[in-house]
Amino acid sequence: MYYGFDIGGTKIALGVFDSGRQLQWEKRVPTPRDSYDAFLDAVCELVAEADQRFGCKGSVGIGIPGMPETEDGTLYAANVPAASGKPLRADLSARLDRDVRLDNDANCFALSEAWDDEFTQYPLVMGLILGTGVGGGLIFNGKPITGKSYITGEFGHMRLPVDALTMMGLDFPLRRCGCGQHGCIENYLSGRGFAWLYQHYYHQPLQAPEIIALYDQGDEQARAHVERYLDLLAVCLGNILTIVDPDLVVIGGGLSNFPAITTQLADRLPRHLLPVARVPRIERARHGDAGGMRGAAFLHLTD
């Protein structure tokens, strides 16, 4: 059996998958915030419960935000303070007496989608998350591309391209990002960015679901806003596609539930690509909340 953990700031979620990559059992517990020992105990207790339930010693893969393993072997994960700065992989491998594999949670999302039965035909899969932030991952021939610093796929921290500023106006504000830079596309293309753009142009503080509801009702202002957002997304994604040239782009995160994102994006891309470039297939993520656990479990299938 393959155990996949999706660990975030508030929850530790475990999914157990069989050899057919089907979910057999899952359980969630709160993430301890202050005690590293309590954090390790929470993970180990879930593994012990799964081992007992299924009568085997399952493999363990973990998806977690941040850098799973820095040069000194420690985890960097600001959203998981109890474990950040600790040698998490080594400690869990020792306590569980098995090889524990860690990767960035966005890479696990992309891996889950790349291993979907419908998508395994595509050699190069790009996962794009449009949620609280903007991120993603790259999967080549069924294996995640992590890079030296585990930051492959940190698309949200690319800066707005010149074409975007031309389209939005040269006086468009370059917002300061949590990473310390200015103009990162995450500040405009995430769910919060979607809402910020609306407030910037229309001076109304609405959340993304409220704007989308207005769009569905035919509200002209909301429709104009969505058109602007999609144009901005196409400009930014065009730059990424010129570098990566994937066969498939799978979009996840809260905004992926808005059909216009996946149905109206492809037609906007050619003007931002080289004339010989082919627009990749663009699809909504198939596995929802289980995607992180699923991809983490499959880290042991990538050898």
From Swiss-Prot:
It is an enzyme of class 2 (transferase). Active from pH 6.5 to 10. It catalyses: N-acetyl-D-glucosamine + ATP = N-acetyl-D-glucosamine 6-phosphate + ADP + H(+). Its EC number is 2.7.1.59. This is N-acetyl-D-glucosamine kinase. It comes from the Bacteria. GO terms for molecular function: ATP binding; N-acetylglucosamine kinase activity; zinc ion binding. The lineage of its organism: Bacteria, Pseudomonadati, Pseudomonadota, Gammaproteobacteria, Enterobacterales. One of its GO terms (biological process) is N-acetylglucosamine metabolic process. HAMAP family: GlcNAc_kinase (MF_01271). Belongs to the ROK (NagC/XylR) family. NagK subfamily. The keyword Iron does not apply. The gene is nagK. PANTHER family: N-ACETYL-D-GLUCOSAMINE KINASE, ROK (REPRESSOR, ORF, KINASE) FAMILY. It comes from Escherichia coli (strain K12). Strongly inhibited by ADP. Catalyzes the phosphorylation of N-acetyl-D-glucosamine (GlcNAc) derived from cell-wall degradation, yielding GlcNAc-6-P. Has also low level glucokinase activity in vitro. ATP binds at residues 4-11, 133-140. Keywords: ATP-binding, Carbohydrate metabolism, Kinase, Metal-binding, Nucleotide-binding, Transferase, Zinc. Pathway: Cell wall biogenesis; peptidoglycan recycling. Gene3D superfamilies: 3.30.420.40. Zn(2+) binds at H157, C177, C179, C184. InterPro entries: ATPase_NBD, N-acetyl-D-glucosamine_kinase, ROK, ROK_cs.
